[in-house]
Amino acid sequence: MSIYQFNFKNIDGEEVSFKSLEGKVVLIVNTASHCGLTYHYKGLERLYQDYKDDGFEIIGFPCNQFGKQEPGTADEIKSFCDLNYGISFQLSEKIEVNGTNAHPVYQYLKSELKGKLNDSIKWNFTKFLVDSNGVPFKRFSSTVEPEDIKPFIDELIGNK
């Protein structure tokens, strides 16, 4: 099993297959525009710029499940990310990451890489690093800075 069997809708409402990312290392992150950790967007964009030419992708999944910190429409989210952080990596439409309506890729990621207490996502900016075969490799809590993920990206890109 891998992420390649799943699809998502991008922020513009277009269907995207994870299969289109085959052979790339992917970081999947649930995001929010009005969170104390929103500054992670800056570090995520830096990671993307540093590694995009090496077969690395980031997909941000806006989510309003934690403190209702992503209340905006798709256009508002896109505008916020562009104006404040110059985000050039992919964003999805707003999704849920926990509960019965959790996006299928999040159901899969959580079943493969559990958190400290259980499989649920605890907060915004939880990160999942997926290897170039589409297999979940490592889960990072919200408090892990994007910069601190670099050694793991290097390891996976080196293993390609």
Q: Could you describe each region identified by the protein language model?
A:
Residues M1-K160:
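Chalcogenol-based redox active-site neighborhoods
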